[in-house]
Each structure stands twice: as C-alpha cells, then as structure tokens.
C-alpha cells in the first residue's frame, strides 16, 4: 500500500484522536499496511507523507509531529 494511503487509513481509523507520527508508523506496520522489507526508509516516507497530506489539506496538523484525520 502507498504510504500516503496507509497514513490516511490509520488516521481515519483513529477518528478524532490526534496521533504522533510514530504511532501512525507503528500502527501501519502492525496492520501490515507498509512492508518494511520492500519499502526503503519507511520512517522517512511516513513523515514525508504526513507532511504532504497536511499541506494538501487532507489531514490536520495539530502540532509538531501530531496529526489527526480531517473532520468531514
């Protein structure tokens, strides 16, 4: 799964809960949404994906490293 899609899915499942990027990464890996053996620099990709999603307005950035699914 694409890292952006994985981040959106994890944040969507969290509902109104604000998650740190490390929690998003952990949940994506635990749910096997991202394969760390076939994806290079998983950590960097998740951080960059979350930043890009926030810039696109698809997720809300709540603070340094904190993200939440966009309401509505």
Predicted regions and their residues:
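The alpha-helix within a helix-turn-helix
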Residues: 25
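Short loop/turn and capping residues at structural boundaries
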Residues: 22, 39, 64-65
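Short beta-strand "wing" residues that participate in macromolecule-binding interfaces
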Residues: 61
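Short, positively charged loop/turn segments that connect secondary-structure elements
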Residues: 19, 29-49, 54-58
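Positively charged, polyanion-binding regions of nucleic-acid-associated proteins
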Residues: 1-22, 47-51
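Short, cationic-aromatic polyanion-contact patches
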Residues: 64-72
């Amino acid at each position: 799964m694409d890292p952006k899609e994985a981040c959106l899915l994890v944040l969507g499942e969290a509902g109104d809960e604000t998650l740190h990027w490390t929690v998003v990464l952990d949940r994506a890996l635990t749910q096997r949404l991202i394969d760390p053996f076939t994806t290079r620099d998983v950590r960097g990709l998740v951080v960059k994906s979350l930043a890009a999603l926030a810039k696109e307005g698809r997720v809300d950035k709540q603070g340094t490293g904190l993200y939440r699914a966009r309401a509505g």
